[in-house]
Amino acid sequence: MAEHMMMSMSHGGTGLQSYRMGVSGLQGPPQHGQHVLRTLPAAGQMMPYGGAGMDGAMRPRPNLSGQMSHHQMQNAMMFNGPSQQQQQYMGPVGTQQLMASMHLQKLNTQYQGHPLGMSNGPMGAGAQQYRVGPSQHPGMQHMPSPALTLNVMDTDLIDEEVLTSLVLELGLDRIQELPELFLGQNEFDFISDFVSKQQPSAISC
């Protein structure tokens, strides 16, 4: 029995050797030729795959170091030569600040009669002071204190004139189907409408 196993193993070994010879030399009967053609791409894929795996393991390291040096160069450019970066960064931020200040000036001119309305002087000074250093993002610290306190007071004290002007601007006065805006009035209106609708039906019945 052991001899039979040894013979089968040796036969398998010779089969493997002949199979390897068939792969390397493209020799053998036509049946083995089909197997060779089927396994040849796999064998061809395994060798370059191993080589690519080694190269792939080696390639990211130079790429990573290259990227690191590139980022370090960018950081060095940002920190060593900030004038170019600030000039590039100043263009869109300046236009955005200009548009925002123009919008605020329009809003302020609408409410100039308001006692807490801001004058154009502190806001313009705040916008100019913010535009001087656009790279410093916390602009609330750089704004002057009167404008900041006026903004806080404006947001805290909202009177009915401001609310009615907003309602008129948004056209909410023309919309009658918003009970959450006029909740106190609509409750009584609903009761009176309900009673007035029920009375004619009671009379007709």
UniProtKB/Swiss-Prot annotation:
Chief location: nucleus
Cellular compartments annotated: Nucleus
Gene3D superfamilies documented for this protein: 6.10.140.2200
Record Pfam families: CITED
InterPro entries linked: CITED
GO biological process, one term: response to estrogen
A single MF term (Gene Ontology): transcription coactivator activity
Entry superkingdom: Eukaryota
Key words, A-Z: Activator, Nucleus, Transcription, Transcription regulation
Entry GO CC: cytoplasm; nucleus
Function: Acts as a transcriptional coactivator. Enhances estrogen-dependent transactivation mediated by estrogen receptors.
Recorded family membership: Belongs to the CITED family.
Protein name: Cbp/p300-interacting transactivator 3
